[in-house]
């Protein structure tokens, strides 16, 4: 499945570059500064996670998708080749520059792909943000999406903020809708690997209900107890799919991706 999605993504890039040569879209990819904002391996990670959305969440071409923390379109670009004209994509992010690029280069060619700036405070990424995460209401109606996904978002958020976002995710999901999100989950195995020095992150500093790699900049990377995450999903009617898809960050084998992936379905209300 992932190989199919990667080939599809490469075809999209080829068409974009051809359009640029013909006087169409000026860029196939965001500038390097915007790609680095969302992390490395821009194309590869985008293709990887669209594969997970299709394979693990059962995303259909005619469904409505919400990308929380969409950045500069790393997932949106490959999704333009998967969602059809009946499908719909919405994404929001704290980066005005990233959203402006997406609106100019993606929405202009795909009107069913919409992007919004969310001026949410983050001590690292948006220190002048207007809203606190706990006060932010997703700008979408109840039960308006089939799939909601977040990649490398909850890995930078404190437990109360994660809980609020999961409440909002449950609100905007249709009954039977699915959610994919990534974490650094702290459980017996990952904590043992951390203690043995096998983990990519040591999470040596403890905060209220979380661990972090940096005492002064805790949002740089946050690990959450798996028990907490499971409890919050249950609180908001999100049934977790078993087994969880643990990542390689802790030194665990086997693994699926780098971060831990949790898939859940909203139960009928």
UniProtKB/Swiss-Prot annotation:
Gene3D superfamilies: Vaccinia Virus protein VP39
Alphabetized InterPro entries for the sequence: Methyltranfer_dom (IPR025714), Methyltransf_Superfamily (IPR050508), SAM-dependent_MTases_sf (IPR029063)
Record's keyword terms, sorted: Methyltransferase, Transferase
EC number, as in UniProt: 2.1.1.-
SUPFAM superfamilies per the UniProt record, alphabetical: S-adenosyl-L-methionine-dependent methyltransferases
GO biological process: methylation
Name the UniProt record assigns to this protein: Uncharacterised methyltransferase MT1546
Organism of provenance: Mycobacterium tuberculosis (strain CDC 1551 / Oshkosh)
């Amino acid at each position: 499945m992932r190989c199919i999605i990667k080939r599809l993504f490469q075809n999209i890039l080829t068409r974009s570059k051809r359009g640029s040569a013909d006087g169409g879209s000026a860029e196939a990819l965001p500038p390097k500064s915007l790609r680095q904002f969302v992390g490395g391996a821009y194309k590869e990670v985008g293709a990887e996670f669209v594969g997970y959305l299709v394979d693990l969440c059962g995303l259909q071409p005619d469904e409505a998708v919400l990308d929380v923390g969409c950045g500069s379109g790393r997932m949106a670009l490959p999704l333009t080749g998967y969602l059809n004209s009946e499908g719909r994509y919405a994404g929001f992010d704290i980066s005005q520059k990233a959203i402006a690029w997406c609106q100019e280069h993606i929405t202009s060619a795909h009107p069913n792909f919409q992007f919004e700036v969310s001026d949410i405070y983050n001590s690292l990424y948006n220190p002048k943000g207007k809203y606190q995460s706990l006060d932010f209401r997703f700008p979408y109606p109840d039960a308006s999406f089939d799939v909601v996904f977040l990649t490398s978002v909850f890995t930078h958020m404190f437990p109360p903020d994660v809980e609020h976002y999961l409440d909002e995710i449950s609100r905007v999901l249709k009954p039977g809708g699915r959610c994919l999100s990534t974490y650094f989950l702290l459980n017996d195995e990952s904590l043992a690997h951390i203690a043995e020095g096998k983990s990519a992150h040591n999470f040596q500093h403890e905060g209220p209900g979380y661990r972090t790699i940096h005492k002064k900049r805790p949002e740089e990377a946050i690990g959450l107890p798996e028990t907490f995450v499971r409890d919050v999903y249950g609180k908001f009617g999100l049934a977790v799919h078993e087994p969880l898809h643990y990542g390689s960050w802790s030194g665990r084998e086997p693994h699926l991706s780098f971060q831990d992936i949790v898939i859940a379905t909203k139960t009928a209300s």
